[in-house]
């Protein structure tokens, strides 16, 4: 993200949180030792874990890290606004006006969520779910009554010709690895809130595809 001349990169994933504090004691711990060049004791003792949504500032060469990595939302979610929708992966940051919108895939494993802050690296408050690939939560729908096979979704929001959209993927062929790209119109209210939108097959077409001709 080019934030008025400051280059920021957002990354990370989160395997386990308070409910699984010993998650990294399995084979993944050896991977972390190799990746980060630290001892097991250093990794297990790291405040807020080495996992989670992380931001670093880069030099203009886009290669050199300028500052220490920092968590942008809490790793420990109990008692926070993120308790029901902890971060899993898929960090994406957008600036809307003077607010920062952090879009991410949650541990619910079917939704794109967002959080809002005045700052790019702290102060985020959970905003809500933008889209669920099973329409879970849309107009109160329960997970038991989901409308499609659910699984991890990734994506973000973008403004095109004055209209905001959410881009994401849903699953096909009953496989978590068969993913169909989708888009829906969204609306950012004056107070910054984004209502959850329904999954459709219209995408950017502004309506159902005409039943004639051919499509790539």
Question: Can you say where each PLM-predicted feature lies in the sequence?
Answer:
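Carbohydrate-active catalytic/glycan-binding domains of CAZyme proteins
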Residues: 1-216
């Amino acid at each position: 993200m080019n934030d008025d001349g400051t280059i920021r990169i957002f990354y990370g994933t989160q395997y386990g949180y308070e409910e699984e504090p010993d998650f990294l004691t399995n084979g993944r711990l050896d991977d972390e030792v190799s990746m980060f060049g630290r001892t097991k004791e250093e990794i297990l003792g790291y405040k807020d874990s080495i996992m989670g949504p992380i931001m670093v500032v880069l030099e203009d060469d886009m290669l050199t890290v300028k500052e220490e990595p920092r968590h942008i939302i809490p790793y420990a979610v109990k008692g926070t606004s993120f308790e029901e929708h902890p971060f899993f992966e898929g960090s994406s940051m957008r600036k809307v006006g003077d607010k920062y919108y952090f879009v991410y895939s949650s541990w619910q494993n079917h939704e794109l969520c967002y959080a809002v802050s005045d700052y790019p690296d702290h102060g985020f408050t959970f905003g809500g779910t933008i889209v669920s690939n099973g329409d879970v939560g849309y107009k109160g729908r329960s997970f038991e009554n989901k409308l499609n096979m659910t699984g991890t979704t990734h994506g973000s929001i973008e403004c095109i010709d004055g209209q905001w959209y959410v881009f994401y993927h849903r699953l096909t062929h009953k496989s978590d690895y068969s993913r169909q790209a989708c888009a829906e119109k969204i609306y950012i209210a004056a107070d910054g809130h984004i209502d959850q939108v329904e999954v459709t097959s219209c995408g950017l077409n502004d309506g159902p595809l005409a039943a004639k001709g051919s499509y790539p």
